[in-house]
Every structure is written in C-alpha cells, then in structure tokens.
A protein has these predicted regions:
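Domain-level detector for secreted/extracellular nuclease and nuclease-toxin modules, and
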Residues: 1-228
Length: 228
C-alpha cells in the first residue's frame, strides 16, 4: 500500500516529509495533459534542466493514461518510463503490435511533437550493429489492453539500448516476467512502476557506462555517439 502501508523502511512506506518538498511542480509551459499527470505516484522527480520534457501517452480511445516518459532532448535519450498496473489495464486483449505497410518498426513519438513542438528527433540512434537491441522501458508485454496502448510502447522515446543477454533473456527479463505474473494478484488497487537507465553524467561521466559510436546520431550532446 502507499502512505501508511508496509512497503519498507522504518516509516512503513510513508514519507516523513509532510510538505512533500520533492513533489513535481507544474510550470507555465507545460501542456495541460502533462500538468494533470505529473502528480501521479508513479512519477519520479522531473529533471527540470531546461532540456528534459515529460511526455504523457494517453489512450484517446479509452481516456486512460497509458504511460509517461522523461525525454532529454540534449542527450536524445529517454531517462525513464513510468506507468501503473491495476485491474482496469492488465487484461491481455491483443497480440504484439506489428507495423503495417509503410509504417516504421519503431515510430517517432507523435506526442513529443504535439505536446512540446519538438520535431528534430528524426533518426534511430540504437547501435544495433554493436550488439544492442531496442529496449522497451515500458514493455510492450505490459500493455496489451488494446492496440493503441500496445503501439505506443514502440515509440522511439520509450527505447534505450539494451544487451539481449541481460535485458531480454537475463535478470531484467525475469524481473519483468515476475512483475507481470504478480500484477493481477495484488491486494491493493494499483501497482506503480518506474524503470530506466542512467544517462546523466556526474563528474567525468562516472554514472555512464560509456558512449557508443553511432554515425547516424548527430544531434546528441556528443555528436556521433549515444550514452549507455
């Protein structure tokens, strides 16, 4: 449970900061759909560094919030994706989305343009030739309620480069499978999830594994490379 529950720590999952000084605060330039979402318990603290943008993916066929992402337009990388599991969205009603004729396998994020007016993300930076896969941070397998929600997980802004042995067949994959198995059985009403990778340099890039060369990626902080 949240608040006074028993989800860990001496305070039983309840913050001692009654004023919630770490809460996300809406800014004047935020679209209304973002303002409405950033107070959700699944949302981590937004970076607010001038180049990061919260993108909220709504399912307009149902009015449901599908998932949200923080996109760093300087790094040309997403920082995390967050979403919820509850009885209203865990049903597996559709198969894995497949692009139709003329569609990209990993579409550009239309909400990045509609919500923030950003149109310069027009490349696929994933260095697949160097052993990386397109890693869904909000997994497509977690969003099978309908095809709208399923397709949104394939947006490039939901991707980070991932090693298959760890992420698609190893520890990460097992964690996701375990979460999916437990989600329909949870006693409380909602499971709040946030996942991502570390892309923020600290000191001399000590939080980054490194940069992988990818000639197509010309607009990143380090041209020709992407952070991993």
């Amino acid at each position: 449970t949240t608040g006074g529950g028993n989800t860990g720590g001496n305070t039983g999952g309840e913050s001692t900061d009654k004023n919630n000084t770490n809460k996300n605060v809406a800014t004047a330039n935020m679209p209304q759909v973002v303002r409405n979402a950033i107070g959700g318990l699944e949302f981590p603290k937004l970076k607010n560094n001038g180049t990061s943008y919260a993108i909220v993916h709504m399912d307009n066929t149902t009015g449901m919030l599908n998932y949200s992402t923080e996109w760093d337009d300087n790094m040309k990388s997403q920082r995390w994706s967050c979403y919820t599991f509850h009885t209203g969205n865990t049903a597996s009603n559709v198969d894995r989305w497949k692009p139709g004729q003329g569609e990209r396998k990993y579409p550009w994020d239309t909400d990045l343009k509609e919500q923030w007016g950003i149109t310069d993300f027009t490349e696929d930076p994933t260095p697949t030739a160097q052993g990386f896969d397109h890693g869904h941070i909000c997994p497509s397998a977690d969003r099978k309620f309908n095809l709208t929600q399923q397709k949104q997980t394939f947006f490039m802004t939901n991707m980070q480069p991932q090693y298959a042995n760890f992420n698609q067949r190893g520890t990460w994959y097992k964690m996701e499978e375990d979460l999916r198995a437990k989600a329909p059985k949870i006693d409380s009403d909602t499971l709040f999830i946030v996942k991502g990778g570390t892309i923020d340099p600290v000191g001399s890039e000590s939080n980054l594994l490194g940069w992988k060369k990818n000639g197509a990626s010309s607009e990143t902080q380090k041209p020709g490379y992407i952070p991993i």
